Regions:
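Long, contiguous binding/interaction regions
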Residues: 1-184
Length: 184
């Protein structure tokens, strides 16, 4: 087990404490409950549609990952078994250094730093398996997701309309996170 694939307890910017861990095959029901707890706007921003529930085939695919070409992490509060956030990548078969990215944070947990924590951990895991770029299709109105992407590394975007196509270089740290060392 590599460092980025081990469970990790994280204190969020809000002070909340969660455990980040890899998705397990038995997580399907918990993922379904998490989806059921998403508001309509969050569902639309993540899936570009508002389904009342995720289809069984989608849940099965979401819980059965190989942790190499398809990785998924979840966030679980220490005092609860329920999933409050999830992120994943799926490697592009024709571009082995690139993977499609997705992230979901329950409405009640948005704005606490959970999305940033999940994506930082997922980026570590991606780099371990040779992925240096994430791609994502994001609604142009979803400024919080675009900001999360910018926090991962340099972002190239194209916007043919209401959907922004983004490519993030996760191997290159973002400029705003670089530390400056001063010597006197």
């Amino acid at each position: 087990m590599t460092a980025a694939s081990r469970p990790q307890v994280v204190t969020l910017r809000s002070g909340d404490v969660v455990r980040l861990r890899q998705v397990r095959p038995g997580d399907g029901p918990a993922l379904a409950r998490a989806y059921a707890n998403l508001g309509e706007q969050s569902r639309y921003r993540r899936f570009f549609t508002v389904m009342p529930e995720l289809p069984e085939a989608t849940l099965k695919q979401a819980a059965e990952v190989d942790h190499e070409d398809h990785e998924a992490l979840v966030a679980v509060p220490l005092l609860s078994p329920e999933i409050v956030g999830e992120c994943r990548f799926v490697r592009w078969p024709d571009q082995p250094d690139t993977a499609e990215l997705g992230v979901t944070v329950l409405d009640a947990w948005q704005g606490r730093g959970l999305g940033s924590a999940l994506l930082a951990r997922l980026s570590e895991r991606a780099l371990e398996v040779g992925i240096g770029y994430f791609t994502a299709e994001v609604l142009a109105e979803n400024r919080s997701m675009l900001a999360l992407l910018a926090g991962l590394g340099p972002v190239e975007t194209s916007s043919p309309g209401p959907v922004v196509s983004a490519r993030v270089d996760i191997a290159e740290p973002p400029r705003q996170r670089r530390r400056i060392s001063w010597t006197c």
